[in-house]
Amino acid sequence: MARGLPTIASLARLCQKLNRLKPLEDSTMETSLRRCLSTLDLTLLGVGGMVGSGLYVLTGAVAKEVAGPAVLLSFGVAAVASLLAALCYAEFGARVPRTGSAYLFTYVSMGELWAFLIGWNVLLEYIIGGAAVARAWSGYLDSMFSHSIRNFTETHVGSWQVPLLGHYPDFLAAGIILLASAFVSCGARVSSWLNHTFSAISLLVILFIVILGFILAQPHNWSADEGGFAPFGFSGVMAGTASCFYAFVGFDVIAASSEEAQNPRRSVPLAIAISLAIAAGAYILVSTVLTLMVPWHSLDPDSALADAFYQRGYRWAGFIVAAGSICAMNTVLLSLLFSLPRIVYAMAADGLFFQVFAHVHPRTQVPVAGTLAFGLLTAFLALLLDLESLVQFLSLGTLLAYTFVATSIIVLRFQKSSPPSSPGPASPGPLTKQQSSFSDHLQLVGTVHASVPEPGELKPALRPYLGFLDGYSPGAVVTWALGVMLASAITIGCVLVFGNSTLHLPHWGYILLLLLTSVMFLLSLLVLGAHQQQYREDLFQIPMVPLIPALSIVLNICLMLKLSYLTWVRFSIWLLMGLAVYFGYGIRHSKENQRELPGLNSTHYVVFPRGSLEETVQAMQPPSQAPAQDPGHME
């Protein structure tokens, strides 16, 4: 038995390492980066991340092939669904005004390993997303010049037919990424100025499209003669919602930039709300005028807006639309390349990624090494790869990040607030970490509840009715309820997505299983709602927690389950690569690991003796607090 104890202890220690949290420090406003971004800067950064190629490509494709004129309803529902995730990011961005976005939010609430995996996937999302936008930018510009750029490259450089590779090397896409990376490395102010310029042009072009589009509108294009407003029915609207949801994924760049915001606790929630409203308004208005200008079934899915003006005889307007699309894609590219090195910087600053990427240039106050290194990597991928097959891969990483952030909001709301640390002789140093194996759940006999319950405790008003939940330590019931909620959310998603097509459930079995899982889901929400939460009047907080984060989780799970199995296979391979990096480097170099080095912590592992409670409590006391021995027994 004694030989097994070290193995059990080592496994327990490993689990402790994997789930250790990054502490929320009081000095969250101190940073090596330059806090220079205003609310307007953050808002335009978010608008640039959302209103890009999707407006000029996705709108026409969904209208023609999925939803018809009802695409505007698809965008409206998708905007509401995105708002659920955006609210979670807004609260975290105000509460933790540091760079890192979903990675950091997961680190402070759920644990180190989960945070690393989320950060690892967000990195890939930005890299592949930047390369895809650059190739779309190159292709759109090439089409304006009758594909002369592609023809020249294939003639003088060559082409190939290799799986996962493009038909020809896209030097233009690689070049625009390198140029954008150079501007981003010059500082946040330079990037913000460029983003302002391109965003202003893009918004003016959108305004032009809406005004001229309403002038040219022909309401009979929504009539029954043309197929009606919703030719694909309700199912088409919902299928369009799944596609349109990805048009709003750019708001997380605001949270990733919160460490450079002048007043993040106010600016981040405000910028997320305003940018999402602007993006939703732009998508809904443009899809409305597009389907009113020409019949939805005559749209060109590759360049719907420009082609619509061509069909109405306004070729000059088509060139304005093409110029606006180029500017819009520039804003998306700048937003992605601006956020990418900041995620790398956050992970490197925490010791989970290579330390060279934590270096901040003293003059520009930006992580130049990460900007240039990952800019080169993105350019290389854009040069060679055919990224169409990896688009769904981006969706999976984004949805997974949304799910973890929503879960983190619930976890953090029911955690006990950290008392502010005061510097002094009695305070532990910056590399000191105090832990206990079970003292977090220890309550002395005879302790009564305080007048103000702690987060995670049962609400006093409900104790007469739910007293059977009151005998547990704060947070214990919440943890179980959260686990049941997540399990039931996954089951609901599986039933909705696979119930008829894959599982081949009979109708009564489908309804029964969906009803049972929904009841479990609602009961877990009621149990969570019966417990005390953190309330901060000085910060933005989401209303209706845990309902809003829970709805976001269910939606994200359903969308993830709709992705192809090849996407999950590629995702698993990427996760394995991330685990190799974490266990090979991150777990040993983590800053939290440095705080736990021998001599820098005060961790006490307790083995319960076969004695009374009094003996157990005495055994837990540190040596300095042990009762003095009888002088007669001293040697």
From Swiss-Prot:
Annotated glycosylation sites: N151, N195, N221, N500, N601
Record Pfam families: AA_permease_2, AA_permease_C
Q: Name one GO cellular component term.
A: plasma membrane
Q: Which residues cross the membrane?
A: 42-62, 66-86, 113-133, 197-217, 229-249, 270-290, 318-338, 365-385, 391-411, 478-498, 508-528, 539-559, 567-587
| Keywords (A to Z) from UniProt | Amino-acid transport, Glycoprotein, Membrane, Phosphoprotein, Transmembrane, Transmembrane helix, Transport
In which compartments does the protein localize? Answer: Membrane
What GO terms describe the biological role, i.e. biological process, of this protein?
amino acid transport
Q: Which residues carry this modification: Phosphoserine?
A: S422, S427
Q: What is its main location?
A: membrane
**Gene Ontology MF terms in the entry:** amino acid transmembrane transporter activity; basic amino acid transmembrane transporter activity
Asked whether the keyword Nucleotide-binding is assigned, the reply is no
Q: How does it sit in the membrane?
A: Multi-pass membrane protein
Function recorded in the entry: Involved in the transport of the cationic amino acids (arginine, lysine and ornithine).
Q: Which family does it belong to?
A: Belongs to the amino acid-polyamine-organocation (APC) superfamily. Cationic amino acid transporter (CAT) (TC 2.A.3.3) family.
Q: What is this protein called?
A: Cationic amino acid transporter 4
Q: Which organism is it from?
A: Homo sapiens
